[in-house]
Amino acid sequence: MTRLSDMIEAEALHFIEPDYSSLVNNGEPAVLICEASPALGDARILLDEEGNPTLFAVKTNGEWYATGWLFRTPSAQELALFEKADGEMYQENHSDIERAFREEFSGKIAKTISPAGEDLTEERIEMVRSLLIEKFGTNLSGTCIDACCGSGIGSAIMRELGCSPLAYDNDDELLSLGFSSGRLKTDEAVCIDGRIASAYMPDAEYGIGIMFGQMYTYTKEIWQPIVEELAGITQKTLITVATEEEAHWVKEWAAGVGRTLEISENTRDPIYDRWVCFG
């Protein structure tokens, strides 16, 4: 896969944003990068195939510094700095740029974060595989959003069934485990807050949330937006929880964004995925 630095013919990039989740920040990155004083020709903008700007980089003190425009609009000051430096523009397909951004930040997680201890057994994986095949079928195609993906059990199975997973979780140690085990890929998964997933994720054909919870009365305000976000951006959605009460909460929250999920009991797993919401 082509890295962002290679796309703009630059050396290693130092991003203003410390992590992928910060790419939606409309304030500080734009201010900080404009403190640079690039020489003529030492500025780059990366456009997608439709001419949308996605990345801005400048060279200062011998190093390339970058900020992402994947989820925000360039500021007037940034564009002025580019023009002053008489910078160059490059162009790549948007999907390739998105993958490269995910790789940029998730690759650092894989390299620098110690993975959590293995949390899956072959028996558990097979139970989830059987459930997903029952609900979705086989020979699938399209994108599958894997919400609160953990170490990637859902992504690995949906990839086997033909989907292209896009996964997220807010636990970088679990993500690191997923990367080291091969269940997750660094260009397919990111560390973000699932309560604002639609700020980063596209609409998708499929959505899964394996073992959501545990949900309690005092954590419902956390889980409700997570469910609403996943249900709101996916056409077919499957969420598993441990208790029937949690399943009814999930059904209610999905209905709030116009989605009808039906509840069923999953006898394969007496603990983690006992109740299924699907629709």
Features from the language model and the residues they span:
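Conserved class I S-adenosyl-L-methionine
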Residues: 139-150
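Conserved beta-strand signature within the Rossmann-like core of class I S-adenosyl-L-methionine
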Residues: 234-243
